[in-house]
Amino acid sequence: MIPHLLCPLLINGQNAATGFSVEDRTNEYLEVMLDGRIVCRYMYAYDNSTPDRLHETYKPYLHVFDADGERPITKGFGGHFTHHRGIFIGWNKIQFKGKSYDRWHMTGGEIVHQKFLDTRANSDGAEIVSLTHWHDENQVPMIEEIRTMSISHVSQPFRLRIDFSAQLKALGSDVFLDGDPEHAGVQYRPA
């Protein structure tokens, strides 16, 4: 088990207002709002009904929005390197039961949100705790992940602090995580 991976991120902005809230758009995404403006959107939908929809939803990630709450400043589905999405976690060289898996480029399996263990918000910040399973090619879980994303406001010149941590637990066999710095761990991909 990897106890924690932590990735703090400070987002520049003009408004350090208070008043966080969380709103779930069931089976699609969860929004974190600050004074009525979207600051983050956790994209957790999983839909394997068509190849295109599966490609769009094969891993959960956190979008970060501009100071007006209108547009993501992080990359989403599509464009060049479609696997680069917001704030996400993965490895391109995973060994499990004698086979190699890629949960970076997402070939031969997915990372699937199972449920929220906790969502909360108050005047100081918001927190999302998500349980995910990292599947093999047969949709059998290899890894159980508890992903925690904490969002709070900070002093100027920044607007937000985002802490991303993950607890990973091997299921059924040992797991070896490997990859180069560009294809392993927690990453932030701007739009």
Indicate where each model-derived feature is located.
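Short beta-strand segments
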Residues: 40, 141-145, 175
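Extended, loop-rich substrate-binding clefts of extracytoplasmic carbohydrate-active enzymes
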Residues: 83-159
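Extracellular structured ligand-interaction cores
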Residues: 27-29, 59-61, 125-129, 146, ...
